[in-house]
Amino acid sequence: MAKAKFERNKPHVNVGTIGHVDHGKTTLTAAIATICAKTYGGEAKDYSQIDSAPEEKARGITINTSHVEYDSPTRHYAHVDCPGHADYVKNMITGAAQMDGAILVCAATDGPMPQTREHILLSRQVGVPYIIVFLNKCDLVDDEELLELVEMEVRELLSTYDFPGDDTPVIRGSALAALNGEAGPYGEESVLALVAALDSYIPEPERAIDKAFLMPIEDVFSISGRGTVVTGRVEAGIIKVGEEVEIVGIKDTVKTTVTGVEMFRKLLDEGRAGENCGILLRGTKREEVQRGQVLAKPGTIKPHTKFDAEVYVLSKEEGGRHTPFLNGYRPQFYFRTTDVTGAIQLKEGVEMVMPGDNVEMSVELIHPIAMDPGLRFAIREGGRTVGAGVVAKVTA
């Protein structure tokens, strides 16, 4: 059978494996890549290639991550797998590898364990929208009732963190049996069933260009006779000459009209997601706009000063603080293009936060910033990064 030619026109979806240590995340990753390559074309990767995860830097934080790609009949998947629990925490909080959906691997021999719970909570906090469960090592459990029990426990755990536990697909199998090419329901069939569940349960993600227009402002210039130009990289959507935009954040929201879009000194009709543009604003004075604000489609994003966040605090080795911080700590929060001072409130019963910890906190900023849940930020002290976080919930 001739291998299908790789086509770039399949929709691209980002996924990853999560779950407790030694429950089989990396073995499953290898099994999916191998079986998809064999069945649908593409390149197989073996366990050792995935397990020797290379180091990467995201926002100055060292993270070990493996990236694997595979095809299903209708999609192209990019899959991340991390070797250690700390890598998952950092990866999910920094958004180094954004996931459109996660595969929760839970060993049927153990049932849900502490990191199973923690990864589900992290997924909820950082906004992973969908979870699919792979109940692994089912070939080592003789008792059907025990499998039912473990499946029920996992579903209840998902429901605890506001995932639809009752409707979540749960695939039973054995990653090792599948990787070894064994037939039967727990072998290769289980991995093909998992891929089919990815295809049907995770909706195709909305592309940046189809979202509402948003551009973080990096710089502001005054051009005599023409007005004020703001520059930045368009994060989402499309902006056309003549459209209205809002300037959001730091000060009161102002509405204005785009009178020109330029790129590399050339005038354009529109600016699109991913492009660096200069945008000319009608009747806006140079001092009314500043770095750290955003240009947005009117009504799509609001400025906020209070939010709950999930934060990873850099360890000493990563260049972070050497000492813990306490309630009321006031660092700078770096959103998109600027620093804003904020005060933190730790959860009840949490006295202090040690370097290397991840923690939930509430933050109150001294200026409002345009934000939605899922927005990433860095925590800085005098220009050096000491933490990374993600907005879990906006509160005021």
UniProtKB/Swiss-Prot annotation:
Q: Where is this region: G3?
A: 81-84
Q: Give the residue ranges for region: G4.
A: 136-139
Keywords, A to Z? Cytoplasm, Elongation factor, GTP-binding, Hydrolase, Magnesium, Metal-binding, Nucleotide-binding, Protein biosynthesis
Locate the residues binding Mg(2+). Answer: 26
Which reaction does this chain catalyze? GTP + H2O = GDP + phosphate + H(+)
Xref: PROSITE patterns: G_TR_1, G_TR_2
Q: Does the keyword Metal-binding apply?
A: yes
What InterPro entries does its record include? Answer: EF-Tu_GTP-bd, EF-Tu_GTPase, EFTu-like_2, EFTU_2, G_TR_CS, P-loop_NTPase, Small_GTP-bd, T_Tr_GTP-bd_dom
Which Gene Ontology MF annotations are present?
Answer: GTP binding; GTPase activity; guanosine tetraphosphate binding; translation elongation factor activity
Give the start-end ranges of region G5. 174-176
Q: Where does the UniProt entry say this protein principally localizes?
A: cytoplasm
**SUPFAM superfamilies from the xrefs?**
EF-Tu/eEF-1alpha/eIF2-gamma C-terminal domain (SSF50465), P-loop containing nucleoside triphosphate hydrolases (SSF52540), Translation proteins (SSF50447)
Tell me the enzyme class: hydrolase
Where do the segments described as G1 lie?
A: 19-26
Q: Which family does it belong to?
A: Belongs to the TRAFAC class translation factor GTPase superfamily. Classic translation factor GTPase family. EF-Tu/EF-1A subfamily.
Q: What is this protein called?
A: Elongation factor Tu
Record the organism.
Answer: Acinetobacter baumannii (strain ATCC 17978 / DSM 105126 / CIP 53.77 / LMG 1025 / NCDC KC755 / 5377)
